[in-house]
Swiss-Prot record:
The keyword Transit peptide does not apply. This is Alanine racemase. The modification N6-(pyridoxal phosphate)lysine is found at K33. GO terms for molecular function: alanine racemase activity; pyridoxal phosphate binding. The active site is at K33 (proton acceptor), Y236 (proton acceptor). The gene is alr. GO terms for biological process: D-alanine biosynthetic process.
Length: 338
């Protein structure tokens, strides 16, 4: 029996994707790169492939695309990170769709019968052509990426720049730019949205207008319960000392599992709705909490993330972003689709 479980609510995942599609009026390219942000790319692909709102998946590299194909995923798979020369045979064999964002990607493909999308850099300074038009019948789609979707003024400049590029193309099947946060702009000339974080019910912006619901629950077992005397040091470096006789618990979840050490002495875990303050430094495999007057006992589940606190809220406490927390989730956490 695993000591830590990440529950993925399939009904809510599908609800969120349908609401995102409904809000935008567009089909969805589901971004499941980096093992679906640490949640599980195979699990996510199998949840989403059956629904009509999802038109394709997007991953970072060829290896991620091959893995999905080997697990039976049939829908189109975009390779966001492009394609290098030695990867082209796998792209052909597994019917993957590379995103061309550098002239070397185009040269790698050569004259092979491989459809591709062209990416434009409209203000990210990362991957993408600046303004070159690729006149090639194999171009299936064109795309860009919003660098600062919370910045309305700059995002609108990017959208305008991309629109001018789009006008230079004819008969392009797929045009996409909006991310989970970017859907708020309802770009009129795109055909698809490209979303990741919001699928999990994580709201990327304040006052997010899409009706999404938290779909992830992260819980770990309580493996020890005891009472510590007053003035007793807790954890490495003795950064916490009990102020009175205190009932404490040890939870089988530490920074090796993805609970950032920056949360030591400043955050909490949850038990039956009760906030359990973290005492002392979070350690590699365990975290010590104040059990207060709860009835918690060894073997009970303690919650890191649930409906009461999302990854977005936990990330805010840790001084980071939810993507980093999710991507850092350990492989020893069992992923369970419910």
């Amino acid at each position: 029996m695993p000591r830590a479980i990440l529950e993925i609510n399939s009904e809510r995942i599908r609800h969120n994707v349908k609401k995102l599609s409904e809000f935008s009026g567009k089909k969805v390219i589901a971004v499941i790169k980096a093992d679906a942000y640490g949640i599980g790319s195979i699990q996510m692909a199998k949840i989403l492939e059956p629904i009509e709102e999802v038109d394709a998946f997007a991953v970072a590299c060829v290896e991620e695309g091959v893995e999905l194909r080997k697990m039976g995923i049939k829908k189109e798979i975009l390779i966001l990170g492009g394609v290098l020369k030695d990867e082209v045979p796998l792209v052909e064999e597994y019917f993957l769709t590379p995103v061309v964002s550098d002239i070397e990607h185009l040269r790698a493909i050569g004259n092979r019968d491989i459809k591709f999308h062209v990416k434009y850099d409209t203000g990210m300074g990362r991957l993408g052509f600046l303004n070159e038009v690729i006149h090639d019948p194999r171009v299936e789609g064109i795309m860009s990426h919003l660098s600062s979707p919370a910045d309305e003024e700059f995002s609108k400049l990017q959208i305008k720049k991309f629109e001018e590029i789009v006008k230079k193309y004819t008969k392009v099947e797929k045009i996409h730019m909006e991310s989970s946060a970017g859907v708020v702009y309802r770009v009129p000339f795109t055909t698809h949205i490209r979303v990741g974080l919001a699928m999990y019910g994580e709201k990327p912006l304040k006052n997010y207008p899409v009706d999404i619901k938290p779909a992830l629950t992260l819980k770990a077992k309580l493996i020890s319960v005891k009472e510590l005397p007053e003035n007793y040091p807790v954890s490495y470096s003795r950064t916490y000392v009990t102020k009175k006789k205190t009932k404490t618990g040890v939870v089988a979840f530490g920074y090796a599992d993805g609970l950032m050490k920056t949360l030591s002495n400043r955050s909490y875990l949850l038990y039956k709705g009760e906030k359990l303050p973290i005492f002392g430094n979070i350690t590699m495999d365990m975290t010590i909490v104040d059990l207060k007057n709860t009835d918690a006992k060894v073997g009970d589940w303690v919650y890191v993330v649930n409906e009461e606190r999302t990854f977005t809220e936990l990330a805010r406490e840790a001084g980071t972003i939810p993507y980093e927390l999710m991507c850092n989730l350990s492989k020893r956490i069992k992923r369970v689709v419910v």
